[in-house]
Curated annotation (Swiss-Prot):
Role: Dual specificity phosphatase that dephosphorylates MAPK8/JNK and MAPK14/p38, but not MAPK1/ERK2, in vitro. Exhibits intrinsic phosphatase activity towards both phospho-seryl/threonyl and -tyrosyl residues, with similar specific activities in vitro.
Keyword vocabulary terms for this entry: Hydrolase, Protein phosphatase
Lineage: Eukaryota, Metazoa, Chordata, Craniata, Vertebrata
Alphabetical list of InterPro entries matching this protein: Atypical_DUSP_subfamA (IPR020405), Dual-sp_phosphatase_cat-dom (IPR000340), Prot-tyrosine_phosphatase-like (IPR029021), Tyr_Pase_AS (IPR016130), Tyr_Pase_dom (IPR000387), TYR_PHOSPHATASE_DUAL_dom (IPR020422)
Enzyme Commission code: 3.1.3.16, 3.1.3.48
Domain of life: Eukaryota
SMART domains given in the database record: DSPc
Similarity section: Belongs to the protein-tyrosine phosphatase family. Non-receptor class dual specificity subfamily.
A Pfam family recorded for this sequence: DSPc
Molecular functions (GO terms): protein serine/threonine phosphatase activity; protein tyrosine phosphatase activity; protein tyrosine/serine/threonine phosphatase activity
Name of the protein this chain belongs to: Dual specificity protein phosphatase 13B
Entry annotation: catalytic residues: C138 (phosphocysteine intermediate)
Organism: Mus musculus
Length: 198
């Protein structure tokens, strides 16, 4: 054995402690940059953004035949109401589709956060039924419905806000308004605190 190998045997190998940096919540500007810079997905009427979870627009929601063909079993309308996307349980009568509606405005001052947990639970419960598929939609499928899908991924799939955005954007371009992004930031911070990652 040469002297170099002997020295290596005698000298203990010191490995530096791995530094795990705490989670840094994203700023509104960095989220908006992420939403605009990473645009790669094509925008169609309906896209599967997570296993058995679809994000779409009003056109997709009104095409009952296509929904049935895709195996959609549950529809979440985040633009419900007479002057928005006026579907509803009555619209889907005679089909196997279950309906959940939220009357939400695509307005930065609208508090969509009050719906995060109830709708996320509805989506989770629906996805736990074998062979279920869920469509979450609004008028364009980029702001209100995208915000709800992001909240679901954060709450029940344990994703950070950035991870959730990147996951969805790999399949569909989205652009939640600034008020919804702020509400998602609050959710992100709360979830990170509750899990001890902040």
């Amino acid at each position: 054995m040469d002297s170099l190998q002997k020295q290596e045997l005698r000298r203990p190998k010191i490995h530096g402690a791995v530094q795990v940096s705490p989670y840094q919540p994203p700023t509104l500007a960095s989220l908006q940059r992420l939403l605009w810079v990473r645009r790669t997905a094509t925008l169609t009427h309906i896209n599967e953004v997570w296993p058995n979870l679809f994000l779409g627009d009003a056109y997709a929601a009104r095409d009952k035949g296509r929904l049935i063909q895709l195996g959609i079993t549950h529809v979440v309308n985040v633009a419900a109401g007479k002057f928005q996307v006026d579907t509803g349980a009555k619209f889907y009568r005679g089909t196997p589709l279950e309906y959940y509606g939220i009357e939400a405005d695509d307005n930065p001052f609208f508090d969509l956060s009050v719906h995060f947990l109830p709708v996320a639970r509805y989506i989770r419960d629906a996805l736990n039924i074998p062979r279920s598929r869920v469509l979450v939609h609004c008028a364009m499928g980029v702001s209100r419905s995208a915000t709800i899908v992001l909240a679901f991924l954060m709450i029940f799939e344990n994703m950070t806000l950035v991870d959730a955005i990147q996951t969805v954007q790999a399949h569909r371009d989205i652009c939640p308004n600034s008020g919804f992004l702020r509400q998602l930031q609050v959710l992100d911070n709360r979830l990170r605190r509750e899990t001890g990652r902040l």
